[in-house]
């Protein structure tokens, strides 16, 4: 069951993490165990060679998984990443990047998922990440 809509999650991220405005993220959609987050193209995300940098892709993957988890559990700001592993598969274009996050397992204390990243308009994956999140005990 989805507990937060894309608009609610987008508003929460921009309220709780003001730096999201700088990264130009937007929550586009959420469904059960799924979220799509877009990082709008900005020259600040480029590395030498004119490609989106690895740290920018990692931050987007982390944010997309956070969104997918919060969509399922509600507003739990203290859920934190405990592991992130990413494979860079091909050079991303200098364009918006789309992150599709899937929650594979959602437990009481841990969530595990993966994120596929794509340059906007290109069906070939540019990176794939697996993540584990710690979910704090509700009081």
What residue spans do the PLM features occupy?
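Hydrophobic beta-strand-centered segment that forms part of the acyl-chain substrate-binding groove
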Residues: 67-98, 103
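Hot-dog-fold acyl-thioester-processing enzymes
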Residues: 40-64
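A generic structural signal for short beta-strands and their flanking turns/coil linkers
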Residues: 23, 33-35, 54, 76-84, ...
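Non-catalytic linker/capping segments at the edges of enzyme domains
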Residues: 1-38, 44
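Hydrophobic residues in beta-strands and at strand termini
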Residues: 39-41, 88, 135
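HotDog/MaoC-like acyl-thioester-processing domains
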Residues: 3-4, 91-94, 98, 104-139
């Amino acid at each position: 069951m989805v507990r937060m809509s894309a608009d609610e999650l987008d508003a929460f991220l921009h309220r709780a993490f003001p730096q999201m405005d700088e990264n130009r993220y937007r929550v586009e959609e959420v469904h059960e165990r799924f979220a799509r987050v877009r990082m709008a193209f900005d020259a600040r995300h480029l590395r030498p060679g004119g490609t989106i940098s690895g740290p920018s892709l990692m931050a987007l993957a982390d944010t997309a998984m956070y969104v997918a988890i919060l969509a399922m559990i509600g507003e739990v700001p203290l859920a934190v990443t405990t592991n992130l592993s990413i494979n860079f598969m091909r050079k991303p274009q200098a364009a918006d990047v789309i992150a599709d996050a899937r929650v594979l397992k959602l437990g009481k204390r841990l969530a595990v998922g993966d994120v596929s990243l794509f340059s906007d308009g290109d069906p070939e994956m540019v990176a794939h990440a697996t993540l584990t999140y710690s979910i704090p005990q509700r009081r």
